[in-house]
Curated annotation (Swiss-Prot):
Region (Disordered): 53-72
InterPro entries: SlyX
Family statement drawn from the similarity comment of this UniProt entry: Belongs to the SlyX family.
Name of this protein: Protein SlyX
Polar residues bias (residue ranges): 54-66
Organism name: Pectobacterium atrosepticum (strain SCRI 1043 / ATCC BAA-672) (Erwinia carotovora subsp. atroseptica)
Length: 72
């Protein structure tokens, strides 16, 4: 290869590397955002699960408070 061809090839590789570094940084930021969103969603699921459990326990009366069926 001639020196100018080598220099052109080196410039192409440097350009590709710079582009890849930018892409990696963009992907890293996306992963960070997704981690935050997942954490937020997990907290929402936990709160909703707790709320649902509390509602279910309040809807069920203890056996001692249940009225007997009408055929008794």
């Amino acid at each position: 290869m001639s020196p100018s061809a080598l220099e052109e090839r080196l410039e192409q590789l440097e350009s590709r590397q710079a582009f890849q570094e930018l892409t990696i940084e963009d992907l890293n930021q996306t992963v960070i955002q997704h981690e935050r969103e997942i954490s937020r969603l997990r907290e929402h699921v936990r709160l909703l699960t707790d709320r649902l459990r509390n509602q279910q326990t309040s809807l069920v009366a203890p056996q001692s408070e249940e009225t007997p069926p009408p055929h008794y």
